[in-house]
Amino acid sequence: MTSPQHSNHHRMIMRQVYYFIVLIALAISSCQRTNIPIATATAIPPTVTPRATTESQPIPGGPYLLRAGISIRSVANADSGSIKLALDPQTGDLYILNSTTGLRRMKMDGSYKVEKVANPKDILEDGTLSGMAFGPDGALYVVADRKVKEIYNQAIIRKGIVDLQGIFQWKTLAETEPYPLSNTPFDHMFNGIIVSLDGKKVYVNSGSRTDHGEEENNHQNFKGVRDVALTAKIFQIPTDAENLTMPNDEDALKAQGLIFAWGTRNAYDMAFAPNGDLLAGDNGPDADFPDELNWLREGKHYGFPWKFGDQDNPQQFPDYTSVGDKRLSSDFTAVQIGAYRRDPDFPKSPGGFTLPVANLGPDAVKYRAEDGSEHDAAKEKLPLYTFTPHRSPLGLAFSTSPKMPADFRGDENTFGAFILSWGAAGGNLSDRGQDLLYLKLTKQGDNYETTATQIAREFKNPIDSVLVENRLYVLDFGTGIIWELTFE
């Protein structure tokens, strides 16, 4: 599911993916409490599975495959802690980003040879690399975060252009003003990035600095501060910018046209559907509320911190108390630090939220009811908006190649896609993630609904994927292995 290399960084990137996320959303403007999935007019079609269910573990200790006609092999080791994959559209090579070791390239000529491209300091003298994406022209955009005076974060987006010697030359596309850190694992910072299909702008995720909109004052350095203008948003930046400064001021950001969408908690990974729609996985809070898949559109608000899926954040209500809240577990960090509490100053909801994609199952649809019981929304013929809590969705990749088998492709009415789950770091819901889902997305009104079918499981915190024709490359954060799954 949504922050590397300062003192807390290694733990934070794991939490970042776990806690995420990009895009909490709902179309309900009232503050009526909603603690279980809402029955709607959404049609629940028959369960859709791509092919016959099997279970095999072709490589001892490796992932289990759950559908016939899929093979798997390890093609490279990218080192533990690698966080991003990106395909160079000019050369076809696969690039690997690691916050510690920098940028490497895996040759896609069948050799899968991995070679160093740049050290972190070649890209940015001072900072932690956290995301990357190629433009259609081969320009590479890298996101980084750096700590300023120990209590602020500054995000930087660097642009690399290959020179005649084949070496990336780097310049700063944009950087933020320093903004307050919370000094908690919920400092998600800037990370996910994607380039528009025409190459004219980049979309960049800035995760929240809170778990669920609570005050995080960083040892009284920022009394009363929750999320700020530079957090919990998707930004859009022209690719022809240079040294653009992004102020920590909402009105100024709006005046510059830099805000694309609001209310995303940590949209760590974004991808374009075949029709050009931009979708992203978003990580829910450190409580048993859903993670999300959102269709990102300019000007929309996706609910954070007032909504998680289609459910209300209870802390916004004056009578809330964490005592007896069955959606909290003692092993959640937010619980351990007392982030769930009575909060009479919680900001009033602006309403007008956009719902996440509805998940019809059969998989990744577990939810926690208000009484603490675990339920399966698909078995109850209810949509879940979108995934089981704590799955931390990321590595979204759409299936478009004619070389992909028909049952793993979309048709005139649907889009096929794959999405990974980093996996639960706490709680006791039976769905623990660390798997690969096949999604079949269908446009319904002004949003999408999807089926979700588990096709592989027991990765080791998978963090990103790239689809090349009928081969899906999956990066395991825990092992550094790059797995190649081939669909026949």
Where are these regions (language model features)?
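Ser/Thr-rich, Proline-interspersed low-complexity disordered segments
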Residues: 26, 31-59
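Short beta-strand-to-coil "C-cap" segments at the C-terminal boundary of structured domains/repeats
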Residues: 160-162, 237-239, 296-298, 484-488
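N-terminal secretory signal peptides that target proteins for export/translocation
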Residues: 1-14
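Sec-dependent signal peptide recognition
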Residues: 15-23
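Beta-propeller domain segments
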Residues: 48-65, 208-258, 264-266, 270-451
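Acidic, Gly/Ser/Thr-rich repeat motifs that build Ca2+-stabilized beta-propeller blades
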Residues: 48-214, 278, 389-444, 471-486
